[in-house]
Amino acid sequence: MLSALIQNGMSKSGDPTDVENNTTNGSSSTTDNANDVGRGVNTENNSKLENDSSNAATITTSKQDPSAVDEATTPRSINTGASTVPEPDNTRRDSVSSNVSTATTESRRRSKVSRACDQCRKKKIKCDFIEGHDINPDQSCTGCRKIGEKCSFERIPLKRGPSKGYTRSNSQSRERRGSQRRRSSSEVSQKGKKPSVSNPVNAVNESKSEVDASLHPGQSATSTTNVSLHPLLQYLPGMNHSAVSASSPSALQQPFWKVPYHEYQNQRRPSLDSLASDSSQKPGGKTNQQQPLPSQSQPQSLQNIGNSRSNTGPLPTQDTFRNQRYYYQPSQDSVSEAGSDNRRGSSAIPPLLNPAIQLQQQQYSYSQFAIAQQQQQQQQQQQQQQLQLQQHLQQQHQLQQQQSLHSPQANTMNASTGISNGGFVPYSGNKGLPSGGHVLERTDSVASDAMSLNASPNIYTAEVESAPASPVQKKRKRSNRSSTSKKGKSTQQNLPATTPTLINYGQIADAQLIDTYYAYIHLRFPIIPINKDTLTNDLLLVNTQPISELHELNNYILLWFRNSLELLIRICLKDKESEEILYQQSTFVSAINECFQKIVDIHPRFRDLETQIDEKIATIYLVTFIILNCTLALVSYNNSFVLGMSVIIFNELKLWKNFIFGNWNTVTGHDKICLRLYFELNTFDSLQSCSFGVPKLMNLKLDETTASKLFYDEVSNDGTGQETDKWNVDEDPERIRIIVDNMELGYFLSRLCQARRSSFEKPLPLVGEHNENKTIPGLFRAFLSIKRQFTDTLLDLPDAEGKLPEMTPELVTRLSNMICDLTTTIHDLLKLNVEVNPTNCLELFPDNSMQTVDESSAHNSAAQSSDPSNIEVGTVSPYVIAIYKDLFNVVELIKNMPTSLIGCVMGTQAPNFDSQPLVLQLSQCMNNMLQITTFTSSLSPFKIFKHELNAQSKNKTIDAVPLWKQKMKSSLAPLQTAITPQEIMMAQFIDIAWCIADTEELGWFNQ
């Protein structure tokens, strides 16, 4: 019934013959309009199946002549408005429209519906639901009829088709987009040459309008004032919204540049470290959109060159520093950053070239001919600027001296930064600061880095406040505030490893840094291989006034020496993990990379001025590399780049020649310090090779007496040898003995790397008796020697054919003695580590308040004089984590061997063999194993990088084949099949020896 009515209605509205028969008094114009209406209805019904048939006819008719509305819609309203045909539901509009469209051609029903019911869709079967009470009285399909339910269409269908705003132009290739960006940037760069581009734009718009008119005849051009413009078009002169009113059809789609741009699309947003090398930024904090072309920027270029310093000229004053680039100043109205004026954050690498040369390099591709004409004028103006700057600096220097004499507060401020007018202040006058020590903020130039230690805080704050800020910098400041917490410290999520972080240097005063180092670090590893008095009263007394490039370099080296030393101290602090931002891995790596990069970047200049640089500065420069390598060893972080670059720089200074040709008895004091530093770098190289299995980078000519020759010096108690005592590594003979003992461990590690089985060059040196080495370095040397003997004995048990020997009383006694000696050494070594410092950290501020220099010095001297055996208590060492890891590996492998040996001893039958002493000895060994487990749980030397101790024991089980054994399998005979219990036990011991050999060849941290 429904199909007949619909067919009748559609035939009356769609067939022009029916319309003409039903209309008796219609004119020819009315008939033509009716024909147009019929054709419009058919077209609309076939193209838009989602609309209702009555609505489609009404909408289509309204677009044409109004006179034909009544005649065209009357038959359709009669058919669709009959009482027998129900009003179609909105949710089923798609089904009705589908039936209406198919009924226009023939009266057959579609073979499938446009949408399956919920039950059929859930079962994934075909649905034959037909809408209509006459055709389908129970309103259910075949599947639902079988289970006695009605079809339901409650599920909301998912959206189909492409996402909103998708255009084919947005998916074009990257090469095409890159070419468009380059063309856009080149067009933007020509704005200084073209007075106006409005006429070409209007011509383009007119041509586009003609194309649109030809494509859409009879339609008026629609307004496109709401369409967003491309960011590059906003910077073209004469380009506005009305000028681009008619664009291409793709521009009418949803634009993908929803966020307004403030910089060109072909430019990236610079980070803190990329500002110095980003060509999109210019001095004064202005972007390229405000920088004119070279033909128009001659006065500005000269001004910038005049304001910048030369390689040999003086440092700019505070007025000229306001014109320097890339001030990263905080917001003045931010409460959380009220004290950020005293914060020195990470900056970009200081340029090693003259800023004038850098400016020429940046402009060379655009103004290579104009610069040749400007050179003479630039030189003249630069000389005038230098004379004015020198006069201004002299006046400012005199004013600072007068203020420092009359103002004790200014003296305290200058002492806190470590440099007072003439250079680093003497240690006696360097007082500590409160816990929130003064920190300065740096800019991105060498001059500003040098200035940060010389200028007074008030002057530098005024410069920061008056520095210009570009829109890009303001954006970065807002993002910086959002990425930091209320305390001004960033969280781990906001500190990626690739982005430099803001490290607040200056939290510990300079006097406290030096005092803490000599009290807790210098004793077990002399990173600064000179005594305290010589360092503070001689080496650090360097002229750092910004008069020439040489003084500027001195100031820069002192700055990063101090920052590196503070980084080392802060890593060693105890109970600071919850507060110290450096305990985050990404922040620590960024801080290490920043310090190392800063000190490496000045090496070309250091090498050029090597003959003019003072020996004191050269020593401090080399000490900075040792500090950074020691920091990495304290956390056991494998960074071969830092070590490799350090070795390269040391080798460029030809320090290795003194180990071959030099006479150590006649070397000067500074040369001896350099030899000590070179020896310490070799120690870190050996430690990293043993820990991670990497190849050794240095191969020095060393022997057993090298450490004592370099570090042991006689101390004169009567004061007659004051000149010779000046270059001693320490002032106390007992402390010198401990230092030499630790340096001998470094030599032993170097020999251990050379004595590997893979490249056997030299045997291990002999180790003294066990009772004579009750120190941590001595016990560890004994442990390494016994471990090598133990593994060699077990690996040599099989003969050339792979047969295992019999378990004789001599072999049982030998193995029992070696396992007992090894266990006793491990027990004593772990016990001593627990007594000295179980966490390998120092507690600098026990009451959350900084101690003064005099109080800490008096406390240390009293402790040393009252109980010399407790000198090492509370000190830290870079060896501890490596020692702990190697001990843990061996304990996990041999912990069951004493029990097996007791059973073997009890089962050995020999006429003259007394098993009772061996059983007692092995029982004591088992007792030591229990205490070793307790000591292992008490030690926690790991910081920042939490190494999994059980990872190696999981891989080095008895069932797994050791890696080194697999490599040596071709040169070894296969072992015979173990049958007896003694043979099975011996085969297990041999596998344990192979696992221990893995750690020696591939590193203690090998996993």
UniProtKB/Swiss-Prot annotation:
GO terms for cellular component: cytoplasm; nucleus. Residues 1-115, 155-224, 267-350, 399-423, 462-496 are annotated as: Disordered. Keywords: Activator, Cytoplasm, DNA-binding, Metal-binding, Nucleus, Repressor, Transcription, Transcription regulation, Zinc. Residues 1-11, 42-65, 74-83, 96-105, 196-206, 274-288, 304-323, 329-339, 404-419 have a biased composition (Polar residues). Signal peptide: none annotated. One of its GO terms (molecular function) is DNA-binding transcription factor activity, RNA polymerase II-specific. It comes from the Eukaryota. PANTHER family: GLUCOSE TRANSPORT TRANSCRIPTION REGULATOR RGT1-RELATED, GLUCOSE TRANSPORT TRANSCRIPTION REGULATOR RGT1-RELATED-RELATED. Belongs to the EDS1/RGT1 family. Glucose-responsive transcription factor that regulates expression of several glucose transporter (HXT) genes in response to glucose. In the absence of glucose, it functions as a transcriptional repressor, whereas high concentrations of glucose cause it to function as a transcriptional activator. In cells growing on low levels of glucose, has a neutral role, neither repressing nor activating transcription. This is Glucose transport transcription regulator RGT1. It comes from Kluyveromyces lactis (strain ATCC 8585 / CBS 2359 / DSM 70799 / NBRC 1267 / NRRL Y-1140 / WM37).
